[in-house]
Amino acid sequence: MEGTEAAAAKPAGGSPQGPKTGSGTASPVEGTSAVEWSGPEPQLDNGHPPRPWPCPQENRTSSLMAPQPPRVWGVQLQGPSVLESKVRALKEKMTVAKQGVSPCSASQEWSSPKKPQCRRGKAGRAGTPSEGSFLPGAVVAPRTQNLPDGQLDGSINEEQPARDGGPRLPRPPAPGREYCNRGSPWPPEAEWTLPDHDRGPLLGPSSLQQSPIHGVTPGRPGGPGHCNKIIHIPSPRTGRSYPFPDGVVTEADLDSTSLTSEEVFVPRTALLGERWRAGDLEALGAGSSVLSLSDRVERNRLLLQEMLNVSGQSPRKVGTPAWTPSWDTAAPERPVGDVDWASGTSLQDSGQNRTVGPNPEPVLSPRHEEATHLLQRARMKARTRPLRASHDIVPTITQGSRDGHRSPARDPRTTPACRDSLQNGHTSDSSSGESSGGHRPRRGPSPSHVRFEDESAREAEFRHLERLQQRQRQVLSTVLQAADQGPLRSKPDLADYINGAPRLRDAGQGTFHRLVGSLDRRGHPAPPAPGSERRCQACGSCIDDPRPAQGKAPPVPRTLQELQAACGMERVLGGLSSPLRLLPAEPRLHMEWIRETHIGDTVCPAEVDSALDSTDNSDNCRTDSEEAGTSQAGWACGRTQGSSPRLRLRGSRPRGHRWSKKAEAELPWGLQAQQHLPRADDVEVENEVKEGRGHTPEGTLFLREDAKPPDLELKRVSLGPQWQPGPGLGSHQPHPLDSRTPCRTAYATTAPMTPESSGPGGQAQVTESHESLEIVSPSSLQQSHAEPSAPHQAWQPTASLCPEGWAPTPPPSRKTTSPVSHRKAALAGLLRLGDQTEPVGIPRPPSRSAVLRTCELPPSQTQPSRPQVRHPLLALSTNNCNNSAPRGLQEPYGGAVHEGRVERGPCSREPEPPLENSRDGGPQGFLGSADVATINSTGITLSLSSEESESSKESEGSLQRTGSGSGGHVLSRASAGAGTGPGSPSAAPLDQNKKRSSSIASTLGLKKLFSALGQSSRPKLGKSRSYSVEQLQPAPPGLTSQSRAPSLQSLHPVSPSHQRRKAASFQNLHSLLSSKGNRSSLYLVAGPGDHSAAGRPAKTSPRRALSVEDVGAPSLARTVGRLVEVFPDGTSQLQLQRSPGGTFGFCVASGNGRPDSGMPSPLPQPHGWGGLSKQGRAFWLWSEAFLVFG
C-alpha cells in the first residue's frame, strides 16, 4: 500500500513538496498521504473514478510522513475561483462518466503544483473530491450504521492495520466521542472548533490509536501546506477504511444513525472558527444516505482531500461559520490543484449532491464564501463589462448629441445597441439586469432630445434637428463670415444669410441696392424702413444689427448673399435651380434662423400666428414661427419673409399643409423668395397683394417692407417693367423706399401691374393663381377681369398674389391654429405671385394651387375671413403673442399687419386708415387691410359673416378704386376690404360664403384646427405656454378687472374641482380665475361692449369652451364672493358675501366629491375684497363643502 501510495504520491506538477517520510510508521496514525480504502473501492454511481486527493503542499507518498505530533487539523479554504472549481468539476464529471473507471482502476495521477499526485491502487485509492465541489472544511466519514466500537473495528478490514502499517486504532465508545485529533470526548451536541492546524494541538498517537479511525498526518506539523492527518474510517459496506482528516470523524458520527454503512460526508471544519455539532454530522450522514454509496465515497474522499489540502495549503480562519452539512447550500471550493476544483463541479452542481444535512443553509466555510464571492464577481464582471462598453459608447454618442455634432439620428444610430442598454440601463440602471448595469451609466435620450414638459416628442426632435442644423449653419456661417456676411451664429446672422437682401436693405438700402445692383433682377432695393425694424419684436433680437451687418456684409457677402439671397432671388426669379440649390443649405439655415427669427421676428401678427404655431409645436412652432417669422420677419424683416418661403420649403412641416404645397409647388419660388431677401419683401408684397386680393392685409405687412417694392421692381424688372403698369406702383415704389406700406402697396399694385408689364405672363400667373385658388380664383379672375385695365392687370397679378395670399390664408384658416401659417401662406402666396409674375411665377401658381386648394377660399371669402379671422386671429395671436408682438411688428414691419392686429376688433378698419395713409400707395393701405384680413382669416373670428360682408363691400369699393386707376392703391384697399375681391361681387360673395364656411369652421374648430390642422406638432398649441390662460388673460386685462369681482359663476370656475383639475396652484387659480373673470365679463359684461378688448377675450373664452361652472352659475348678475386663497391640498378659501337682501344659497362644489370635506368657518370681517365683505357678513368657506347660508 505504501509503495503504491508512494508511487501515486509523486509530487503533482513537480510539487516542491516531497514525501516528508520515506517510510510509513507503525504509528497508529496511518502514514499514507492518500486515503486507503480497505477492500475494492466502490466506483461512484456517477461513474467518477475515485480521485486521489493531493496534499496541498506535500506530495503524498505511500511512505508515511514522519509522524507528526498529532495536531488538530483544520480545513483551510484555499480554493480556486468558484468558476474554476465548477469547470474542473464538470470536466472531471464528464471524464469520469466517460471513463467509467472502476474503483480499482489504475491510480489516477492528479498533478498540482501545490498538491502531490496520489494514485489509487487496487488495495486502496486516494480519496478524490467528488464531482460536486465539497466544502473545504467538510470531512467525509464513512457511514457506519452506528456500529459498536467492536463492530466498527470488525467492520474495518483486517488488512487495514497491515496496510496502515499499524494496528487499527480502537474506537472509543460512542458516548465518549473524541476529536480524533484530540481524543477529547465530543458530545453529539457539543460544538467544537477545530483549532487551526498551525496552532492546533498535536494529537498523540494514543489518541489516534484510541480512535477507530486511522489518521495519517501527511503534512509537516503546523505547516500550512501540510495535509492534515487522514483518518481511515472503515466502511461497513466496503470494508475499507475511509481516510478522514483528524478530528473530522467522531465516534458519534460513526455511531450516529446518520452514519450508515454508506459513506457520508462528514462536515469538514471550514475554518478553525467553524463550529460543528455532532447532530449536524449525524444529520449530514442521514442526508448523505440519500446519495449512492459510490457518490458518498467519492464525496468523502473529496472532502478529505479538500480538508487536507485546505489545512495544508492555507491557515484556517477562525470565526468562519462552520460549514453546515447541507451540500447543496455549500458550494465548496477546492484548492486550485484539487481535481474537483479542476473539474469545477461543486457539490451543489452535482445533481445527487443535494442538501445532505438537515440544515439547508450550511454555514459557508471561508473558502466556500470566497468561491461564492468570486462567482458573484465574475457574474458582475460579465454584466459590467458589456455595460461598461455600452456605457463608454453611450457617453460618446450622448456627448456628440449634446454637442450637436451628432445628428439626433446619429444618437439613435450609435446608441441603438447601446440605446437598448442605455434605456435598460439608464432607464433601469440596475433593474435592467446585467446588460442594463453597463448601460445605466449611459443616458437615454441625449440632452438634445430632452423634452420640455410643454413640448411634444416631435417638437423635441425638431428642436434637436434644428440644433443640428444650426451647427451646420454655423459651418455655413463660417463660409458666409468668410464672405463678410458673418457667421450664422444668431438669428440675425441667419436672417442676414437667408434674407440677406432684405437685411441689406434694412442695413442700408444703398448697400442693398448695390447688392441689388449686381442683382438687379432681384429687384430688392433694401427698404431702409425694414432696416429700422432690425429688431425682432418677438424675440427682441436685433434684426437691425443683422441687417446692417448684412448691409455691411452685402458688399462682401453680396457674393454669398447675392449668390444665396440675391442669386436665390435672381435664380428664383430667373430660375428655380439656384434657389433650389441654395435651398438645401439655406433651408436649414433659414429654417433655423427663421424659427429663431420668428421667435424673435414673429412680432408681427404672423409672428403671433407663429407663436401660436410655436405654441402648437415647439418644432413646428419654430417652423411656424419661421413661417410667421417669415411673414412677420418679411413684414418685420424682409429677410424673414424671404427666409420664410425657404423655411416653408424646407420647413414644410410647420407650414405643413400650406407650405408643403406652396413651398413644394413654389419651392423654387420659395427658394427665390428666400434666396433673394428682396424676394422676401416681394413675398411680403405678394402677401400684401395676395391679401390685397384676398385681403390685402399682407399689403400692410408689406408696409413695413419698403424694400419689397424695389424687390418687386427687381422682380418686375425680371418679369418685365411691372412697376410701370400701376401709377400706384410708381408712387408706391417711392413709397416702398419711403414707407413700407406704400412700397408694399406699390408692390401689390406692381404685382397687378406686373401682369400688365408682363402681359400674358402676369395674367397667366394670375390664371395659375386662379387655378390654384380654384374657388378663390374665380373671384380673383373675376376681380382681375373686373378690372381689365391696368388696374385690372394689377388685379390679375393681385389675383395671382391674392390667390397666393388666400391660399396661404386659407391654410392659416385651415391651420387656423396659427396666423403664422396664414402669414406664411400669405407670404408664400405673395412670393408666389411675385414669382409667378416673375419667371418663377409659374411655379408659384402650382404652389398657390396647392395653397389655394388647401384653403379654397375665394378671395372675398379669404378677405372677409381674414378680417374676421383677424379678430379671432388677434385673439389667437393674443393668446400666443398677446397681440403685442403683432402690433410691434405692425409698426416696424408693416402698418397693415400691425394695424391688422390692432384692428382685431375693427381689424380691417383700423388697418384701413393706415392703409388709407398708405393709399398714397393705395395698395399699401389696402394690403394692410388685406394683411389684417389674412391674419384674421388665419384666426377666423366669430364675426366672420359681418366682417365678410364688410370685407366684400370694402373689397368692392376698393376694387372699384383700383379699377379707377390707382389700381394698386385701390386694389390694395379693395383687397383689404374684400380680400379677393370687390373685383367681382359675385365672386366676392362666393368667396365670402366659402370664406364664411372656412371662417366658421375655423372659428368652431379653431382649437381643433390649431391642434389638428396645425401639423402634428401644432396640436401643442394648447399645450404651449403662450396659450396659457395667463397669456390669454393679459390681452383682456380690462375685462378681467371688470369681471374681477368673481360672480358665483366666477367663483365656480375657480371651484376646487377646477383648481384640482388645473393643479391647485394659486397662480393657476389666478390664471383660471382671470380667465373665468373674463368669461364672467363675457357673460355679464360680454354684452357691455368691450368688443375690442372683450372681443378677443370673449372669442378666446368661446374658443376655450364654456365650462360647466360658467353655464351652471345660477346667476351671473351678482358676485357671491371671492376666492381668497387656494391651498396646496386643492382646497380654496372663498369669501362669500351675503346679499344685502338677506340670505342666499350657494353651493361650493368640490371636484373630489367629498361634500363634507369643506368646513365653513365664519371669520372676523375678512380683509375687504373690493367691498365684497362689506356687504353683510363674509363667510370663509373651504371649497370642499356644500353650504347653504341663510
Curated annotation (Swiss-Prot):
Tell me where on the tree of life, at the top rank, the source sits: Eukaryota
The gene coding this protein: KIAA1614
Spell out the GO cellular component terms annotated for this protein, sorted alphabetically and separated by semicolons. apical plasma membrane; cell cortex; nucleus
Q: Which organism is it from?
A: Homo sapiens (Human)
Polar residues bias: start-end ranges: 102-111, 343-356, 747-757, 777-786, 1039-1052
Biased amino acid composition, Low complexity: 425-434, 814-823
Record field: compositional bias (Basic and acidic residues)? 402-413, 685-696, 703-716, 898-912
What's the protein called, per UniProt?
A: Uncharacterized protein KIAA1614
* UniProt-listed InterPro entries: DUF4685, PAR6_homolog
Residue ranges of region Disordered?
Answer: 1-77, 98-223, 313-366, 378-457, 613-663, 685-823, 831-850, 877-930, 942-999, 1015-1063, 1087-1106
Show the Pfam families listed in the entry: DUF4685
One GO term (biological process): establishment or maintenance of cell polarity
Q: Where is the composition biased (Basic residues)?
A: 378-388, 647-660
